[in-house]
């Protein structure tokens, strides 16, 4: 069921209401201008793009893709806001911040920075994202490598490159311990932030660029491994819709793996010591398109795993950062996730999604780990 409806109990926030509104425009019950009108904007506003309706709804209505199309049409008619363009091109912004990480991190926590962010539509109660002192790509050459012949290609997403390179470091160490060589191909943003803002043309351009960059590896049989579920699953799911006529897409989609899937497919697992019990919160796109099974099984190589039946965490990419969404975002988290984390005791909290980990930190003060980060801590010396 739609996460926003679960906290508002407003019929307008149901999958049914959103689908019916669109159907009414398509069949002529409502005039065409309603597609980009104020009422449509309100109906779509609290859709968090979780994709649950794509698998849980009996009709398999993909409202997340519908919202992307609505935002695209609104942008074409009324123009895209500065906030939308900045959010869609987050990788570009973080790359600039990473040029002077200490200065950026020091200034981003100031009251002036929060006020400036508020002018761009960010709720001032949210912490602004920090950047790492050294990007993942600059650390990569110094990391250990497996002797092969098994190889994987790591899709270096925005968050791993600029914010949490320790996750990528952990993943490479785990693969190396299993004898696997990790390749780091050049990539551009997967396009997920652009799709979330309706910037479909820009997302399509990035999809085509990534396809050109990655296809030679994929064609040679190298699996493409992603650390951020929403990024790698954009390649697996959304690229088919963005580039339906490109015959290479199916091969790329078939080669895309979540980190945990790739780890489980190895002939030999890395040597791990026994870890603490784990509380796992799954990412929405992963739950909708893959399920949490691979993550549970990967963590179970070293730990007892309990899964939170929590639905959406409430952050949903940039949704929870936006002014006007903060309260409902926190209510989504408070439904089940935050109480479960507060009651986790000695269990280590694990969440594959970047926005999920940020929401858990904001809502409970507790830092959640990525599966690769957690398992790398357990590598036997």
Named regions from a protein language model:
Residues 3-7, 25-32, 39-55, 152-158, ...:
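Glycine- and acidic
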Residues 1-46, 65-79, 88, 103:
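Ferredoxin-type iron-sulfur electron-transfer modules and their immediate structural context
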Residues 1-3, 12, 39-61, 93, ...:
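Cysteine-centered iron-sulfur cluster-binding motifs in ferredoxin-type domains/subunits
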Residues 64-381:
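Iron-sulfur cluster-binding electron-transfer modules in prokaryotic oxidoreductases
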């Amino acid at each position: 069921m739609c996460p926003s409806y679960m906290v508002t109990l407003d019929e307008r926030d149901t999958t049914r209401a959103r689908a019916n509104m669109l159907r009414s425009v398509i069949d002529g019950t409502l005039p065409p201008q309603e597609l980009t009108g104020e009422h449509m904007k309100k109906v779509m506003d609290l859709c968090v793009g979780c994709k649950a309706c794509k698998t849980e709804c009996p009709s398999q209505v993909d409202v997340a893709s519908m919202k992307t199309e609505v935002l695209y049409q609104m942008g074409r008619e009324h123009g895209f806001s500065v906030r939308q363009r900045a959010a869609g091109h987050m990788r570009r912004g973080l790359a600039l911040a990473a040029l002077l990480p200490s200065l950026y991190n020091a200034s981003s926590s100031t009251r002036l920075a929060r006020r400036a962010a508020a002018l761009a539509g960010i709720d001032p109660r949210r912490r602004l994202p920090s950047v790492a002192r050294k990007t993942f790509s600059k650390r990569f050459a110094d990391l250990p490598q497996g002797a092969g012949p098994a190889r994987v290609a790591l899709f270096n997403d925005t968050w791993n490159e600029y914010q949490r390179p320790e996750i990528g470091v952990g993943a490479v160490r785990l693969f190396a311990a299993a004898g696997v060589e990790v390749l780091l191909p050049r990539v551009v943003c997967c396009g997920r932030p652009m799709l979330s803002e309706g910037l479909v043309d820009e997302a399509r351009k990035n999809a085509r660029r990534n396809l050109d960059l990655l296809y030679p590896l994929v064609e040679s049989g190298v699996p493409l491994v992603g650390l951020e579920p929403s990024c790698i699953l954009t390649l697996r799911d959304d690229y088919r819709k963005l580039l339906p006529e490109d015959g290479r897409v199916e091969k790329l989609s078939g080669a895309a793996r979540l980190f945990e899937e790739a780890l489980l497919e190895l002939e030999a697992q890395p040597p791990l010591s026994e870890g603490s019990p784990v509380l796992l919160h799954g990412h929405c796109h992963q739950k909708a398109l893959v399920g949490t099974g691979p993550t549970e099984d990967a963590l179970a190589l070293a730990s007892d795993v309990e899964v939170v039946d929590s639905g959406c965490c409430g952050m949903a990419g940039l949704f929870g950062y936006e002014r006007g969404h903060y309260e409902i975002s926190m209510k989504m988290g408070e439904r089940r996730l935050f109480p479960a984390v507060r009651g986790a005791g000695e269990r280590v909290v694990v969440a594959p999604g970047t926005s999920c980990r940020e929401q858990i930190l904001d809502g409970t003060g507790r830092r959640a780990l990525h599966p690769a980060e957690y398992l790398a801590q357990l590598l036997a010396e």
